[in-house]
A protein has these predicted regions:
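Short, surface-exposed ligand-recognition loops at beta-strand->loop->(often short) alpha-helix junctions
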Residues: 21-31
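An amphipathic, aromatic/His-enriched active-site/gating alpha helix that lines ligand/cofactor pockets
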Residues: 9, 32, 36-48, 67-101
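Residue-level signal for secondary-structure boundary sites
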Residues: 26-28, 72-74, 108
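Short flexible/disordered coil segments
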Residues: 18-20, 76, 80-85, 106-112
């Protein structure tokens, strides 16, 4: 993290943030898959929070925002059965591959 970015992060808050953006061709099916995934992911070791957001301006677009205690927790989750099951369940219900991005916690606040 750059020195400038580090100045905006609260002391002691070190998060690994991941976003997954999905564009569906079968919205009801995708929401069912993602809802199950969110519940199971929240139980994973190191998960700080997971949110599911739906776009108001682009119908069928959904965003999953994950916060992890460490990069190792996030990597373990991406290799987990929960993640693999979610990915397999998305077969045939997405307009294209999901957009997955890793974020730097430039300004983060932890409510814990």
């Amino acid at each position: 993290m750059s020195d400038v970015a580090a100045e905006h992060v609260e002391p002691g808050v070190d998060l690994t943030i991941v976003t997954l953006r999905f564009d569906s061709i079968d919205d009801a099916s995708l929401l069912a898959v993602l809802s199950k995934y969110i519940v199971l992911t929240r139980m994973h070791d190191g998960c700080r929070n997971v949110d599911l957001c739906s776009s108001v301006s682009v119908p069928g677009r959904h965003l999953v925002v994950q916060k992890w205690e460490t990069p190792e927790h996030q990597r373990r989750h991406f290799d987990s059965a929960t993640m693999i099951d979610m990915a397999r369940s998305c077969d045939g219900i997405l307009a294209g591959p999901p957009d997955i991005d890793l974020w730097d916690a430039t300004s983060a606040h932890d409510l814990r």
